[in-house]
A protein has these predicted regions:
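Histidine-centered phosphotransfer motif of kinases
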Residues: 117, 121-129
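Membrane-anchoring alpha-helices and their flanking helix-loop junctions
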Residues: 1-116, 134-203
Length: 203
């Protein structure tokens, strides 16, 4: 399989991801913000993440990053494409569950509700899970160190910096309800104990 085929597959999959983001971004206008935290920092993190996408464009459009490739079998690389697709499905599912509650920044809106349906039934931050799934898929499908690091490093920095503040903000807004929600769910992956309990409770 020629490298061009992997690049074309990655381009198509990323266009699907960006289309999903633009679609839901369009629906967030017109809601009144009540609380917004660390606005400048949050905007910087988003810009850092966007900047990390630039090397991916160089990979797709040029051969400049070819010296940074690493060896993977064809089958494994196509598995990367599957991970990107699955990550995008989780991304869309998360957006649909959140509805008007979604924001790219740390903010509480008027009428903000605690969402515990869809993927939020099992994990508190499925969008981060989808971002890491997509990033893992990009790393495998491209088989390129620069592409992998340019996506995963900003994504990891964003997650580590903001996750505690995000949960603290939710506790301030929802109190014991969110504390109980934390007990029942994992941050990025479901708690096995909860999955077993739900499985045992099925008729």
């Amino acid at each position: 399989v020629h490298e061009t085929q992997f690049k074309l597959a990655l381009a198509v999959l990323l266009l699907m991801v960006f289309y999903a983001r633009l679609y839901y971004q369009r629906g967030r206008k017109g809601f009144e913000k009540v609380v917004i935290k660390h606005e400048k920092r949050e905007k910087f993190l988003i810009e850092l993440f966007a900047l990390g996408l630039v090397p991916i464009l160089f990979y797709l459009l040029t051969s400049w990053l070819d010296p940074f490739s690493f060896s993977l079998s064809t089958e494994i690389r196509w598995l990367g494409g599957v991970l990107i697709f699955m990550g995008n499905l989780l991304f869309i599912w998360s957006h649909r569950a959140l509805g008007k509650n979604w924001s790219p920044l740390l903010e509480i809106r008027k009428g903000h509700t605690l969402v515990t349906k869809g993927p939020y039934r099992f994990i508190r931050h499925p969008m981060y899970t989808s971002i890491f799934l997509i990033g893992t898929g990009i790393s495998i499908l491209s088989a390129n160190w620069i592409v992998s690091l340019s996506y995963m490093l900003p994504a990891t920095i964003m997650y580590l910096i903001r996750i505690s503040d995000e949960e603290e903000m939710m506790i301030e807004r929802f109190g014991d309800e969110y504390t109980e929600y934390i007990r029942k769910t994992g941050r990025l992956v479901p708690k096995l104990s909860i999955l077993r309990a739900q499985s045992n409770n099925r008729p």
